[in-house]
């Protein structure tokens, strides 16, 4: 197969399925051959990311990701994409394993926020406890001179319920709970824009988009970027040249 990209997924599987569905439905097609070429590694056995980030005595998820990246690197994909925000805890270590361009979903999303909402000084952040605990998005926002609003103590339990109880355990999206979280971040904490810092939250946005709030959806953004890059490379652009605009430092 020529000109394909590799997806490091399975964190969780339903969220990865959402990413794949987005790229398949958004690419303009007239025939089978117009779809994108990609290999999906749906490694559902990767240990819980938040558990390790908060407690290093828990299984380290780096080694599973390392094995997946090295295995795919042997096939020489045009670029890597990893649709899991919290897994970017090990982004630098994973990207260093290969010369293949490795997109940084969180960084790309933050730059999209700056581009789309240049006058906003802060953005509401809802994410896994792992991402919050290690300041993954907070640090990326600081790089571009923006602030993250995390809300009060009532926010994280609602986010955890939506991510873990509803989506990861039951495979459902509670529309009302998702909208309540967004409304609380907007009305109580003054967030004109809210960043969906977990791909399960991106799934919630896909399934329950009927609300009036501005969101930055990293999975939706990386899906569009994946399509853009894959088509440029298919049309003859060098992969490193194509990805250069998104390889933010």
PLM feature segments, named:
Residues 1-249:
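Non-catalytic structural scaffold of enzyme domains
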